[in-house]
Swiss-Prot record:
This is Complex I assembly factor TIMMDC1, mitochondrial. Keywords: Chaperone, Membrane, Mitochondrion, Phosphoprotein, Primary mitochondrial disease, Transmembrane, Transmembrane helix. Associates with the intermediate 315 kDa subcomplex of incompletely assembled complex I. Interacts with TMEM70. It is linked to Mitochondrial complex I deficiency, nuclear type 31: A form of mitochondrial complex I deficiency, the most common biochemical signature of mitochondrial disorders, a group of highly heterogeneous conditions characterized by defective oxidative phosphorylation, which collectively affects 1 in 5-10000 live births. Clinical disorders have variable severity, ranging from lethal neonatal disease to adult-onset neurodegenerative disorders. The chain crosses the membrane at residues 80-100, 137-159, 165-185, 189-209. GO terms for biological process: mitochondrial respiratory chain complex I assembly. One of its GO terms (cellular component) is mitochondrial inner membrane.
Length: 285
């Protein structure tokens, strides 16, 4: 069976075949899609949060801020614990150093040394061992004691949003009870009473000093917190205004660049490879 010859192409068809055939349906809506996509990606600016309740302030105390930094109160607790550990180490280590050196000299009277330097070095080694051993015992106990006391006291101050003498008494009682909890119920009660008695004069002195200065520590912190919140609120309002005007700026910039973008798109369309037509396929057949 013979295949019928292809129909002759007209002059208009031949002229149109010189241009590449492309499907540009997606290019028509490119600008609108870009605008919608940019509007969807607008940054969300949350409103700054101000803690009102006691639990919110406690979460702020033991949590981290936007820059992943701990609070100043928690940093002060850590610094105080490190300082107390060093002081306790020195307080327990120096007497132990002297006592261990004297005890070694008394117990080594009958020993024979090669020279005087060897004897002095042996005595210093014994004294250093005593300094490290007893200094460590005093150091970690003092650090833990001060950490528990400051943590309880600071937590009560932050939760109630004020300073009070009862906070020092409660902190001393809790710390003393925890330190004597291994003895039993009697040790727990006795440690709490001793801790409360020790916390009362300390709290009284600090409260008197704050009253003499005219402003408590918690009042100063509250003022600083409010000032920081107002600063964050102003910054949030400024960022919110920028975010509201951002779609208009994007749309205006797209309209300004529209002729240049159209010229680039036309040039890109003309540079695309030519699509095979039905007439060309028939010619090949």
């Amino acid at each position: 069976m013979e295949v019928p010859p292809p129909a002759p192409r007209s002059f208009l068809c031949r002229a149109l075949c010189l241009f590449p055939r492309v499907f540009a349906a997606e290019a028509v809506t490119a600008d609108s899609e870009v605008l919608e996509e940019r509007q969807k990606r607008l940054p969300y600016v949350p409103e700054p949060y101000y803690p009102e309740s006691g639990w919110d302030r406690l979460r702020e105390l033991f949590g981290k801020d936007e820059q992943q930094r701990i609070s100043k109160d928690l940093a002060n607790i850590c610094k105080t614990a490190a300082t107390a550990g060093i002081i306790g180490w020195v307080y327990g280590g120096i007497p132990a150093f002297i006592h261990a050196k004297q005890q070694y000299i008394e117990q080594s009277q009958a020993e024979i040394y090669h020279n005087r330097f060897d004897a002095v070095q042996s005595a210093h080694r014994a004294a250093t061992r005593g300094f490290i051993r007893y200094g460590w015992r005093w150091g970690w106990r003092t650090a833990v004691f001060v950490t528990i006391f400051n943590t309880v006291n600071t937590s009560l101050n932050v939760y109630r949003n004020k300073d009070a003498l009862s906070h020092f008494v409660i902190a001393g009682a809790v710390t003393g009870s925890l330190f004597r909890i291994n003895v039993g119920l009697r040790g727990l009660v006795a440690g709490g009473i001793i801790g409360a008695l020790l916390g009362t004069p300390v709290g009284g002195l600090l409260m008197a000093f704050q009253k003499y200065s005219g402003e408590t520590v918690q009042e100063r912190k509250q003022k600083d917190r409010k000032a920081l919140h107002e600063l964050k609120l102003e910054e949030w309002k400024g960022r919110l205004q920028v975010t509201e005007h951002l779609p208009e700026k994007i749309e205006s910039s797209l309209q300004e660049d529209e002729p240049e973008n159209d010229a680039k798109k036309i040039e890109a369309l003309l540079n695309l490879p030519r699509n095979p037509s039905v007439i060309d396929k028939q010619d090949k057949d």
